[in-house]
Amino acid sequence: MSPQYSGTSSQALPPGYCFNEYQIEEVIGEGGFGIVYRAYDRELDRQVAIKEYIPASMVSRADDMRLVLRSERFTRIFQAGLISFIQEAKTLARFSHPGLVHVLRFWQANDTAYMVMQLYSGETLKNLYSRQPEVVTETWIRKMLPPLFSALKTLHDQGYLHRDIAPDNLQIQANGEPVLLDFGSACKEIGHLTDKTEIMLKPGYAP
């Protein structure tokens, strides 16, 4: 994950909040189903990214930092998304490929779950194209595709499909190398359960 973010979140953990060796520094990304933080690993003296499962429309943050359901009717959907989030962390942690986001560990706390990932430089393809559309030429894309195909082959060889290959889920590092970010499994699982799959699966990017 990368440090490109300019917004704020009232639901986010505060700077300085700690999980064992990890200390939250700031929010660097946010979507409808998760918040990504830049954090400092005090044991290994490095920065990492931590993603928190937090479907904002279903939960609120209590004073003790736990997530609280806004309504009991969200229980089944929230738990299904949580299970998918944890399974995705386990799956991604199996791979060590420069084109796939590197998950270092995960855990459950605050009635939700977290995954620790490598912190990547650069920005998403979506942001890059919005900021410098002239950079994303056919020649540039052709150069970017081989390492992306290699990452996909690694997944396919192990029987996995990445169904969220979209510009906002593809990190372009400072050296130009692409990194496929998370599968968005929790988002998809919740989409299935709420009959909004056509929205959650990003038409044009997911089968």
Segments the model singles out, each with a brief description of its role:
Residues 63-94:
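AlphaC helix of the eukaryotic protein kinase fold
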Residues 106:
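Activation-segment/catalytic-loop signature of the eukaryotic protein kinase fold
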Residues 110-124:
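Conserved short submotifs of the Hanks-type protein kinase catalytic core
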Residues 125-136:
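AlphaC helix of the protein kinase catalytic domain
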Residues 144-145:
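Activation segment signature within eukaryotic-like protein kinase domains
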Residues 196-206:
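Conserved activation segment of eukaryotic-like protein kinases, specifically the C-terminal portion
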